Amino acid sequence: GLRVSELCALNIESLQPNSTARVIGKGNKERVVPYGVPATRALMRYLIVRPMLAKKPTRALFLGVRGGRLDPRSMRDIVYRVAAQAGVPEISPHDLRHSAATHLLEGGSDLRTVQEILGHNSLATTQRYTHVSAERLRQTFTQAHPRA
């Protein structure tokens, strides 16, 4: 659920031992964002090879081909390329952020928690993600209710 700029700004020390990351978001506000087991495993594998990517010492977590901090444009290009290779065209990093929020809401998370994870100032901004959940509720009701 991170913004591309937040992901690119992560430093190694941003990762916490309890599978959370300390993220500096919009307005220089810090928040703690959890991540799951698959991300933890991927990060562990990445951290093993990361020293080979660094051309000089850097605190940056994600590195580009020249060994410096990966920039948001390069991150977007990577997402577009990997999505196309996977046969999922027209997907952006923001689509992934939107999907993460939607999955949290559909999984039963409350709106306030999702707001905190996404780093939104306003609950109204987070509410934009609820329309998909409402649609899913309607579909489930129609399919499951005997008199719908």
Model-predicted segments: where are they?
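A short, glycine-centered helix-capping/turn motif at helix boundaries
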Residues: 1-9, 107-109, 120
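Hydrophobic packing within well-folded, soluble alpha/beta domains
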Residues: 7, 35, 43, 79, ...
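Short alpha-helical segment immediately N-terminal to, or the first helix within
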Residues: 10, 103-104, 117, 140
